[in-house]
């Protein structure tokens, strides 16, 4: 997708009346063709915009799925070995640290903040 010129996670929005878990299941199905179950909340990414509105992205992961990968209008999908990710183009420069929130038990938050005019982040 032109909006995400590189590897990124499946994702999207929560529809009115939809739970977070149901949104994760729906978005993964729409973008990958996989039917997942038992998604577990494993972290958040959050920030405030210039008008002090807070944005929160929820990270979920699961090992429970059925089906075959199918690319969609959102982009091409494929399985990739974790060790190869550092050699591939990723959609955002912070992808390796986002992955740490998914994988490291002692991390649960990826917090962006303004440091003067620049954006910085902390892993917590």
Indicate where each model-derived feature is located:
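Short loop segments at secondary-structure junctions
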Residues: 1, 62-68, 82-84
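Charged phosphate-binding loop/patch that engages nucleotide di/tri-phosphates or the phosphate backbone
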Residues: 101-124
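N-terminal strand-loop-strand
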Residues: 1-9, 35-36, 40, 62
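NUDIX/MutT-family hydrolases
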Residues: 70-102, 122-123
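Conserved Nudix-box catalytic region and its N-terminal flanking loop in Nudix hydrolases
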Residues: 1-29, 117-124
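Active-site-adjacent beta-strand/loop module that shapes the phosphate/pyrophosphate-binding cleft
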Residues: 46-68, 100-101, 105-106
């Amino acid at each position: 997708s032109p909006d995400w010129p590189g590897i990124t996670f499946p994702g999207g929005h929560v529809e009115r009346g939809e739970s977070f878990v149901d949104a994760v299941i729906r978005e993964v199905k729409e973008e990958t063709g996989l039917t997942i179950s038992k998604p577990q909340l494993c972290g958040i990414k959050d920030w405030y915009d210039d008008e002090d509105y807070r944005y929160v992205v929820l990270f979920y992961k699961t090992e429970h799925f059925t089906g075959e990968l199918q690319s969609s209008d959102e982009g091409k999908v494929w399985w990739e070995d974790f060790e190869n990710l550092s050699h591939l183009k990723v959609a955002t420069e912070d992808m390796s640290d986002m992955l740490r929130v998914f994988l490291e038990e002692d991390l649960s938050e990826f917090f962006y903040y303004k440091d003067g005019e620049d954006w910085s982040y902390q892993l917590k």
